[in-house]
Amino acid sequence: LAWSNVDLKAQETITNAFDDLKRTGTVNEQDSEMRQATSDTALQKLLTQKPAAGYFCFAEDRMHDIRLDQIIPARWTERVFDTWLQLKGDCQPGEFYTWQIGVFTPFKELKGVSVSFSDLVNADGNKIKSTSFQCFNQEGTDTDGQTFRKTVCIPKGYVQALWIGMDIPASAKGIYKGKAFVKEGSSQPVEIAIELNVSGS
């Protein structure tokens, strides 16, 4: 039995509210930073910077869950251009670390979007294997315990959050670097630089 869209939206609202409560001590969904849409002026300026891929990607940490689906948050147009394709995060050994890639499609519909990964490597040459990572939008395990794969399509003018999960080994320690690759079909991928600081016990 798979969740319906209504079920998923309801769960998303509960999760977002819980995260707000942890961060701020209050629940105020509409005042969330990720609910504040960018201005028309900022959006038009962004659209003049059309990427070679024909769509925008924004790396986003798990503390700023993507909530808008037909307009981008002001946070993205306020960020420095060079940071759009960078994820820097902190996690602990043995943690299941999650983050997001926001894909914005103002110019065209995307068909067959996929995400792949390189290994993450630290200064000592230790690796977190790419096989430890997954994009939940395209693959996973359903409520019956069955594995699945899905084709991800994004309509023109929409924002799609691609959620990523990374299984960090219990032995991992240090700063690990690698890349995620977002692509449509067989086109050239958009590269996102990943830097994870793994520390603690």
Where in the sequence are the language-model features?
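Short glycine/proline/serine/threonine-rich loop/turn segments at secondary-structure transition edges
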Residues: 170-178
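Beta-strand-rich extracellular modules
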Residues: 167, 181-185
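Long, low-complexity or tandemly repetitive, helically biased scaffold regions used
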Residues: 1-5, 9
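Short, solvent-exposed loop/linker segments at the N-terminal edge
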Residues: 89-95
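An acidic-aromatic substrate-binding cleft motif
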Residues: 188-201
